[in-house]
């Protein structure tokens, strides 16, 4: 994971101390386009497993799909501010074509490893967003100049129910909060993966996903 992180930094020209608007925009688009893949792949596999074994899934599918959908919304919101170039779109397609089958087979043979990998991925995303917000708040940085007074997109205001005068920094704070929640994918790797999901057990008094 350490090697992947620094390779990703190199590809996206990421300067931790004073990143440029362009490098961060590219980084967020690529990061969020990939982050929505694992949850959907895992949910898809578990959907077929439930059909094949004629058994309930006990809430895993709905939880993983919600995570994937949330990551997709992060991407759509980021695209309201940053525009994806032809190179970026080509890179996303190429990586997705490799990543999707690789994660699918990983989930077949060792699902706990995939959940652990996603946990590390989300932890890395948290570090990225914390650093971006810190740079926006620091006068004299490139991101402060570009984004300090940028308003939040209408889509973000509606999705996170932000006030009408919310800023782009507020939006990034909401995305970071989501990533902080997603990093608990770590804990999924410690659970028995084909028994009652812990969330469903806690919600046994109300209707819950099956």
What are these regions (language model features)?
Residues 1-210:
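Non-heme di-metal
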